[in-house]
């Protein structure tokens, strides 16, 4: 497997400085959300082609790949103006990502944490937004990767499969698989069976995996953990990777730079 990180876990840096830092830390690649990670860029509206060229050159020089350009948008929001902004921003980022040499543009399908009823109500809005973004992805031949999250419109395996079938374009619609964002009931879920079900159903669509770990504190509060010290069970995911996609990118999220070495070692053992 190739090992990467969500780069803004290291804070904001200059373009050249970040590329050098990631190489020194031992990563093969990174997920870049440009306004969150570069000192030169504070919003998506700030991005210029000169930035994109600098990023491409700096990361090529340091031999750090960009498997994901992060552009996480509120695609399912019932507010039309919010959705319009999400769609137009993603379309623009598809162009930037292609120029930058990124593998995919990654997004979730909402911002807020939704109730079960809200997830269902937001689904039609999500699909409308997604179909419009996919028109641009197809036009410029660039991949969009959507990330299922159990508290968003793209919440469950059934919804994910329905979305894949409706778009019907595996060349341009891909998935980011984040196991921790799919584990709604960790206390009662047979993780081995659950991951096998997901991977058997949509594994061919997965381009990247996000890797993180956590525990549940008081009132089930989410508490990030070092890899291997929380409730995630990666054995079946690891087996599937070796059998099916041994060259896939594993991107560490919620990285604590102080424990980067241990987390990188964990991912290399997967």
What kind of region is each of these model predictions?
Residues 3-7, 30-32, 66-71, 105-107, ...:
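Hydrophobic faces of well-ordered beta-strands that scaffold small-molecule active sites
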Residues 9-11, 34-36, 73-75, 109-113, ...:
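Active-site-proximal loop/turn and secondary-structure-junction residues that shape catalytic pockets
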Residues 12-22, 85-94, 191-199:
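Short, acidic/polar
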Residues 16-17, 53-54, 58-65, 75-177:
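Active-site acidic/histidine proton-transfer and metal-coordination neighborhood
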Residues 18-35, 101:
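Catalytic domains of carbohydrate-active enzymes, especially glycoside hydrolases
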Residues 22, 30, 59, 86, ...:
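Conserved, mostly hydrophobic/aromatic
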Residues 30, 121, 131-231:
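Acidic/histidine-rich catalytic cores of soluble enzymes
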Residues 33-55:
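Glycine-rich, proline-tolerant flexible connector loops at the mouths of alpha/beta enzymes
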């Amino acid at each position: 497997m190739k090992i990467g990180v969500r780069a803004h876990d290291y804070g904001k840096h200059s373009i050249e400085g970040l590329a050098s830092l990631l190489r020194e830390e031992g990563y093969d690649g990174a997920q870049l959300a440009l306004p969150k990670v570069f000192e030169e860029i504070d919003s998506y509206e700030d991005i210029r082609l000169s930035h994109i060229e600098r990023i491409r050159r700096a990361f090529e020089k340091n031999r750090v790949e960009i498997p994901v350009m992060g552009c996480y948008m509120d695609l399912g929001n019932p507010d039309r103006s919010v959705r319009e902004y999400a769609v137009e921003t993603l379309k623009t980022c598809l162009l930037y990502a292609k120029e930058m040499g990124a593998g995919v543009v990654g997004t979730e399908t909402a911002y807020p944490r939704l109730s079960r009823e809200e997830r269902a109500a937001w689904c039609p809005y999500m699909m409308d937004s997604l179909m419009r973004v996919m028109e641009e992805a197809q036009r410029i031949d660039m991949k969009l990767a959507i990330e299922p999250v159990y508290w968003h419109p793209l919440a469950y395996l059934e919804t994910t499969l329905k979305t894949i079938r409706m778009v019907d374009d595996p060349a341009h619609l891909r998935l980011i698989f984040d196991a921790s964002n799919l584990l709604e009931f960790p206390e009662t879920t047979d993780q081995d069976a659950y991951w096998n079900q997901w991977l058997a159903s949509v594994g061919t669509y997965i381009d990247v995996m996000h890797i993180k770990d956590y525990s549940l504190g008081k009132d089930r509060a989410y508490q990030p953990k070092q890899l291997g010290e929380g409730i995630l069970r990666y054995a079946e995911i690891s087996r599937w990777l070796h059998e099916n996609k041994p060259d896939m990118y594993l991107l560490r999220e919620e990285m604590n730079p102080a424990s980067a070495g241990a987390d990188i070692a964990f991912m290399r053992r997967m």
